[in-house]
Design a protein with these regions (language model features):
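Mature soluble binding/inhibitory domains
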Residues: 1-465
Length: 465
């Protein structure tokens, strides 16, 4: 004994359509009202043929099916309220959680010049709490010779100088037709460390004083590798309330690798689709600074500081990034008026799955175990629809392939080596043609990212169903 009930669509051409992991097909001969079809379950390899007739006066179709030389009853009845995977409300839209409090900056003390401070440095410039520039490729020799590049308002300036015995240096950058830039740099040491050297001080340019915050790139030997070594996925979280017409909605995302020597590599995809590569090294105080120029030579950038630390159930590194896009960037199609936003960032250690192991480990071992959720700007080219949200039940298999069964065309590709996901959604009848991407944060048990609809972006995420 047994049976099943499935929700299907009786199409305008009188064919039966079913959206699910099983295969159900059927056709109706319009001249006679006779229907035939079959149902196949790939899990059991069972195929059940069926046939019947349309009873127009009763408003249903009835017939029989045959399996293992036994017959059963077939009933197809009309309705628009039958349930199916994904027809229920998806519930609250989950968002990436941020730590309740920012990491504390390490205490430092001014120190005299020492050969132990020789090496490479990198860091940021700040003014009034905002990140305003960066320090790149800074090198100090054992004798105190100092060189590097300072980035202010998107402009890059090389500088040279010499640290005195007190660990201080004054550098002057001469600009043609513009006032000089003056830098006051001081060597410091993070309290409780033997090689956690820092550079403090300031650069004064065009009436603004920018504070210096740079760190020494320590040497991690093979016998004592960087404790942060490993793979991570990151999310750059959009505010809860953001107008996607004025600045990108959705979360930026990234894959990050920290080598045993503490070097950081990877690629960040910002919410507008712009990409930036990672660089730099984790400091002795587990801090990592990032400064990357964006949008050519327009002065755009993404910059900030992240701290590696364990925040239970939230993150393994966190901080903020300032993201600046100037007005009227050439050849840009989205957010042409520019924007200036500072967003929280969290990262999770990423453990690539073994064969047969689901990377999204909190999902149930069944079909339709996850939600794909989109929320933000209108996803349709048909203004009357005003399609601002979309929820679809999806299947994340133990082979880390992602499946969707439905009338619209949704493709999902997960790269298990990096933890990143990409996809598309096409629904021609409703004028939907989207691309999206995101990252799996294993520590929080969700995928977050962004989708592109026309010239605006919104939030894409996946959560357990």
């Amino acid at each position: 004994e047994g049976g099943f009930a499935k929700t299907l669509s009786w199409l305008g051409n009188n064919a039966l359509a079913y959206y699910g992991p099983q295969t159900l097909t059927g056709t109706t001969t319009t001249s006679t009202g006779i229907l035939t079809g079959s149902y196949t379950d790939p899990a059991t390899k069972l195929t059940v043929p069926f046939s019947g007739a349309v009873l127009q006066k009763q408003g249903l179709a009835g017939g029989n099916f045959l399996v293992n030389n036994q017959a059963g009853y077939l009933l197809i009845e009309p309705g628009t309220t039958f349930g199916y995977p994904g027809s229920e409300a998806a519930g609250p839209l989950l968002r990436v959680a941020l730590p309740e409090a920012a990491a504390s900056a390490p205490a430092t003390s001014v120190v005299a010049l020492t050969p132990l401070a020789a090496g490479s440095y990198g860091g940021l410039l700040t003014h009034g709490g905002d990140i305003t520039g960066g320090l790149e490729s800074v090198v100090i020799s054992k004798t105190g010779a100092l060189s590097g590049t300072v980035v202010i308002a998107g402009k890059r300036y090389g500088f040279k100088g010499t640290l005195g015995v007190d660990g201080a240096a004054t550098v002057v950058i001469v600009r043609t037709g513009l006032p000089n830039i003056t830098g006051m740099i001081q060597l410091a040491l993070a309290d409780g460390t033997t090689d956690g050297y820092q550079l403090t001080g300031s650069f004064a340019a065009d009436g603004t004083v920018h504070a210096v915050d740079a760190a020494f790139y320590p040497i991690y030997p093979k016998t004592a590798p960087a404790p942060q070594a490993g793979q991570y996925t990151l999310a750059m979280r959009a505010p809860d309330v953001v107008d996607p017409a004025t600045q990108p909605g959705g979360d930026g995302y990234a894959s990050l690798k920290v080598s045993v020597t503490g070097d950081c590599t990877g690629t960040l995809t910002l919410a507008d689709g712009t990409t930036a590569t990672f660089g730099g090294r984790v400091s002795r105080k587990a801090e990592w600074t990032l400064h990357r120029s964006l949008y050519g030579s327009t002065g755009g950038y993404v910059a900030g500081k992240l701290t590696f630390r364990d925040v239970p159930s939230v993150s393994d590194l966190d901080g903020t990034l300032r993201w600046l896009k100037p007005n009227a960037v050439p050849a840009t199609k989205s957010y042409v008026a520019g924007f200036d936003t500072t967003r929280g960032v969290v990262g999770s250690r990423y453990i690539p799955p073994l064969a047969g192991q689901r990377a999204f480990s909190t999902l149930a071992n069944r079909f339709d175990n996850s939600w794909l959720r989109l929320s933000g700007p209108d996803m349709s080219t048909q203004p009357a629809l005003n399609l601002l949200t979309m929820d679809r039940a999806t299947t994340w298999t133990s082979a880390n392939t992602l499946l969707y069964y439905g009338p619209d065309k949704i493709t999902l590709t997960f790269t298990s080596t990096t933890g990143l996901l990409t996809g598309t959604c096409v629904d021609a009848t409703r004028g939907v043609n989207l691309s999206f991407g995101g990252a799996l944060l294993q520590k929080q048990g969700l995928v977050t990212g962004r989708y592109l609809a026309g010239a605006q972006t919104g939030l894409m995420m996946m959560q357990a169903r």
